[in-house]
Amino acid sequence: MAEHLELLAEMPMVGRMSTQERLKHAQKRRAQQVKMWAQAEKEAHSKKGHGERPWKEVAGLRPRKHVLFPPSVALLEAAARNDLEEVRQFLTSGVSPNLANEDGLTALHQCCIDDFQEMAQQLLDAGADVNARDSECWTPLHAAATCGHLHLVELLISRGADLLAVNSDGNMPYDLCEDAQTLDCLETAMANQGITQEGIEEARAVPELCMLNDLQNRLQAGANLSDPLDHGATLLHIAAANGFSEVATLLLEQGASLSAKDHDGWEPLHAAAYWGQVHLVELLVAHGADLNGKSLVDETPLDVCGDEEVRAKLLELKHKQDALLRAQGRQRSLLRRRTSSAGSRGKVVRRVSLTHRTNLYRKEHAQEAIVWQQPPPTSPEPLEDEDRQTDAELRLQPPEDDGPEVARPHNGQVGAPPGRHLYSKRLDRSVSYHLSPEENSAPDALVRDKAHHTLAELKRQRAAAKLQRPAPEGPETFEPGLSVDAGTSQPDCGFSTIGDPPLLKLTAPSEEASVEKRPCCLLM
């Protein structure tokens, strides 16, 4: 028979053969195989002829396979098959009924899962622990209550099962029970034992209190709380996985590392997210845990989280953390810009501020000039409250004394003394502009006392200008063409302090002397 390497070497040649050639080649190889087999059989018979007999003929028996299993495996396998006789033999031979497999599961756990009441009775009679716990702290009562096996629950309670046993998820048997009759049995038993809600909460807090006491003992001994334990996990990993808020708070106060990783690259936040501990997730993130931390297989806490509530909380915290980091980045960038230009930036801002203020004043002066240069409206506008007040003030004006002509202000400024402000009632208005800053201004400019006006005051001055026209040159006397309306009288000289005197209305003559128009104000 050809060797394996020889067959591999001839494969390219066989691939180039035709169908008939391949068939002949296969027959040749088959003949070689039969020949070699016949030769091997001949050699075997020749050895038997020389006195070498097979061991079967010498012993007269078939060989027995000796495969041995540990007692724990054998007991659990027999209990899973519900083999009462075999289990009885194991127990009689001295095998402990509390033997467990690698997951901490005992034969009694298996009976409560499979609903083998007689097997459970036999194990309990042999001394099985009714409160045995597996690797996740489940007792046989947890298993029976979860599966809804009422008769097994009653049996375990009668044998002293702990009704307040808490598993690694913080659940008691009645928390896991969904069958109504089984749940009623558990609640009745708890009521008979006098268990209250306070007792339930205390029982839930027992594991955390035990770990808290252990931590305090370690602190007194000066131990490092960040040292890794089994599988590289730290105490903060354990607290995060079990939801121990007080323990985690103490560890964080003592400086426990939030970035410590176990052998799988998991940080404490990974453990809290995987086991659905939403309070621990918030606590760790509040102390600066990295929501983007990755394990050895590039898994973030969000990737390993299977609980929808915890997942939503992680997403919310991630959005808040990203927004906070962006805000801090902007503040740092702004601080760097301010620091780099601290030598000259203040002066530039002040120069720009003064220029802007000057331009604003100039714009206001230009707007005021446009208002003064507009022609009076053709139709009389209805007087507002401020116009009525202007009319009342005009009635208080004294007639001008006879004498040589004096310089008149333009646009019908009333003839009050220069130091007298006609709008004393409006001095509380805000000052909007300043026309003439010089102390000695020309007669046609506003004096300093009248330099501050608002647009409403200018409107009143224009209303007053309609009622009073400039007289022709010469002594200030009434012309023959001027007439006084009926029902009015000449006002007294001086300002009257009581009441409002009647308004003197004058009718202009048909021909007026031309008066040279001057600009109303000076633009600075």
UniProtKB/Swiss-Prot annotation:
UniProt key word Cytoplasm: no
Sites of S-palmitoyl cysteine lipidation: 520
Membrane topology per record: Lipid-anchor
Disordered, as annotated region: 368-421, 462-524
Pfam families: Ank_2
Subcellular location: Cell membrane
Database matches in SUPFAM superfamilies: Ankyrin repeat
Record carries keyword Cell membrane: yes
GO CC term (a single one): cytosol
Predominant place of localization: membrane
Tissues expressed in: Highly expressed in testis, followed by liver, heart, brain and lung.
Disulfide cysteine pairs (residue numbers): none
Cysteine methyl ester found at: 521
Biased composition (Basic and acidic residues): 514-524
Keywords: ANK repeat, Cell membrane, Coiled coil, Lipoprotein, Membrane, Methylation, Palmitate, Phosphoprotein, Prenylation, Repeat
Protein name per its UniProtKB record: Protein phosphatase 1 regulatory subunit 16A
Gene this chain is encoded by: Ppp1r16a
